[in-house]
Amino acid sequence: MSSSPDVLVVGAGLAGLSCARQLHEKGVSIQILEASDGIGGRVRTDHLHGFLLDRGFQVLFTAYPEAQRLLNYPLLDLRSFAHGALSWFAGGMNKLVDPWRTPGSWKDALQSDFGSLTDKLRIARLRRRLRNSSTDEIFCRPDRPTKDALQSEGFSKEIIHRFFRPLLGGILLDGKLNASSRMFEFVFKMLSEGSVCVPSHGMGAIPIQLAEKLPAGSIRLNARVDALHENELTLAGGESLRARALVIAADGLSAAHLVGEVEPASRSVTCFYYSAQEPPVPLPILILNGDGAGPVNNFCVISQIAPSYAPQGKHLISVTVLGTQALTDVQLGGFIIAQMKNWFGKVASSWQLLRSYRIAHAQPQQLPGALEPPQRPIRIRPGIYVCGDHRANASINGALVSGTRAAEAVYSDLSR
């Protein structure tokens, strides 16, 4: 590896890996500097006693256009959630069936308590409209809070509260539905066009696959960048590195610090993982908190989706709480188990806590107006570029697209 590569990339998250890989494929020499002890950024998987613990509940939407272009889905061995969801309200579990992807389910879908017939017809209308819209069209539409968009579609208060609030709360980390309506429409389009999956070896398999095509020695771990000046980076230990181009692919807060921008607002989330002897729900399905009571927003038995997430004879339960609570793990865990006992009975008392993750900066906030323009500038000043989901949209697709745009800008400039 040359001591002076053409490009230094700061951050081995999805955006940085996407950028570096595409530059390498064009014959540009690169080196990635990663502050932590591993690649993936926020998309990492820990191994604990035979369990696979993603750092927060995460999924891959197979319809993501850039993921389809850059990732090899068969090699990821993707395992799919069932289409639809369960939602707890009115003292019981209620099933929302996706009749478009579940053969023979139209009767069940129309007869379920999940919204009125009018609500279901409006979901069909929304689904058709978004499937007929390109992602570029969606991100150029007038922006407003998601709750306003749902109300303007004519959805009832009941289905907004029981379905859209916890579903979008889990995806956009926004239980109040204040996030950009552009993000809501993009997410709903992706849900309508593809599956929701996890790789059999954990979400961390995604960055590993991106990194596999990079040259040996091109990723340097535990290399925190403290400052940049023109075409030079200074590491935490005082070492200086130079390159023809610098790509800042760090998280939004770190990137803002390095390039002198205002720190972007972000959303936080908490995830608790439990080990269980038996699955409380023997289905590979997402479970939503439709009545809003208690801390848990969404829940799943992740080993029902991907059995490899748990050792033989055990099951892995993932519980998502929006925000990072001031409570201790013991206190919050007590409230979680109390809520789960209400849903599933005393069996929840036997669950064993494996680990909790409190992620203060899980996603860019992206309120209405934050996605204007839909793609923020990549080229900050001559020789310095910034990429990440905070430059596009809060999704795996946004991170990958941003990395691609950075690679294209760098290659164009270096080729002049």
Which ranges hold each PLM region?
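Glycine-rich FAD pyrophosphate-binding loop
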Residues: 24-48
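N-terminal Rossmann-like FAD-binding beta1-loop-alpha1 element of flavoenzymes
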Residues: 5-32, 411
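Glycine-rich active-site loop/strand segments that organize a redox cofactor
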Residues: 43-62, 124-136
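Conserved flavin/dinucleotide-binding core of flavoenzymes
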Residues: 308-416
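Mid-domain catalytic core of redox enzymes
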Residues: 226-334, 338-343
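Mobile amphipathic helical/loop "lid" adjacent to a hydrophobic cofactor/ligand pocket
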Residues: 64-68, 72, 76-177
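Helical element adjacent to the flavin cofactor pocket in flavoenzyme catalytic cores
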Residues: 184-232, 241-244
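Short beta-strand to alpha-helix junction loop
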Residues: 58-65, 141-142, 153, 189-211, ...
